[in-house]
């Protein structure tokens, strides 16, 4: 696995933008044979991105062929009827750990899990199996972030705010959650509904360790919909 210290990674992503480059099978940029996501990555890097967040073994392997930027890796896999699907079990962690990436992100919400574990026990199992792997907790509330950090994750991401039944539904970043996590002394990577550069600046000034922007950069369908909706108001 990528042997980078937490401190070195923080220094590398400081004052920059991590770009999430993903496309799921039902989305326009998904290609069965691959090849599209690396193009997005190259464009993001040329634009100044200092890191990449990516989904799936295939995409990450292709991305590593075109960039040496640090990667936050996930595997989205459904386990119905349970809701968590972002690196939701040890199976996905094992697959990501083989890819030599800097950070593995996992669903660390309090929702019922397919493996039946508490999130604290899951984190501890991952830490025991991969003690040198940096981990990011995708959470939706302050409590989830604090609990994940206490269980041993390195970074707390606001990725799932608004995507759990009990978190605020807003069309934009959860500034309050980001601020509260930072005030709690956690190493925060802000992510989720960061639509505009001004949002990123506000978040940066809250004291986060990193900022992930996805849809506003790499999902042209969503970007188009936002413009169309604006002119129809």
Curated annotation (Swiss-Prot):
Pfam families (alphabetical): NanE
Molecular-function GO terms, alphabetical: N-acylglucosamine-6-phosphate 2-epimerase activity
Pathway: Amino-sugar metabolism; N-acetylneuraminate degradation; D-fructose 6-phosphate from N-acetylneuraminate: step 3/5
InterPro entries, alphabetized: Aldolase_TIM (IPR013785), NanE (IPR007260), RibuloseP-bd_barrel (IPR011060)
A GO biological-process term: carbohydrate metabolic process
Enzyme Commission (EC) number: 5.1.3.9
Catalytic activity: an N-acyl-D-glucosamine 6-phosphate = an N-acyl-D-mannosamine 6-phosphate
Keyword Oxidoreductase belongs to the record: no
Record SUPFAM superfamilies: Ribulose-phoshate binding barrel
This protein's GO CC annotations: cytosol
UniProt keyword annotations, A-Z: Carbohydrate metabolism, Isomerase
Keyword Zinc listed: no
Broad EC category: isomerase
Main function: Converts N-acetylmannosamine-6-phosphate (ManNAc-6-P) to N-acetylglucosamine-6-phosphate (GlcNAc-6-P).
Membership in a protein family: Belongs to the NanE family.
Protein name: Putative N-acetylmannosamine-6-phosphate 2-epimerase
């Amino acid at each position: 696995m990528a042997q980078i210290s937490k401190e070195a990674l923080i220094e590398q992503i400081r004052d920059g933008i991590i770009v999430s480059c993903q496309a799921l099978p039902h989305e326009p940029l998904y290609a069965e044979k691959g090849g599209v996501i690396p193009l997005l990555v190259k464009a993001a890097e040329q634009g100044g991105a200092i890191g990449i967040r990516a989904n799936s073994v295939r995409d990450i392997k292709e991305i590593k062929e075109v960039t040496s930027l640090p990667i936050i890796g996930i595997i989205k896999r459904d386990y119905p009827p349970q809701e968590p699907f972002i690196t939701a079990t040890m199976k996905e962690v094992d697959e990501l750990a083989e890819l030599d990436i800097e950070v593995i992100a996992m669903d660390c919400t309090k929702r019922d899990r397919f493996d039946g574990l508490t999130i604290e026990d899951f984190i501890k199992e991952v830490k025991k199996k991969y003690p040198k792997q940096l981990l990011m907790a995708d959470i939706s509330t302050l409590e989830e972030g604090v609990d994940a950090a206490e269980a041993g994750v390195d970074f707390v991401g606001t990725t799932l705010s608004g995507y759990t039944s009990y978190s605020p539904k807003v069309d934009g970043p959860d500034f309050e959650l980001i601020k509260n996590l930072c005030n709690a002394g956690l190493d925060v990577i802000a992510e989720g509904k960061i639509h505009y550069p001004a949002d990123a600046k506000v978040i940066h000034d809250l004291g986060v360790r990193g900022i992930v922007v996805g849809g506003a950069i790499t999902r042209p369908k969503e970007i188009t919909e936002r413009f169309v909706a604006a002119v129809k108001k």
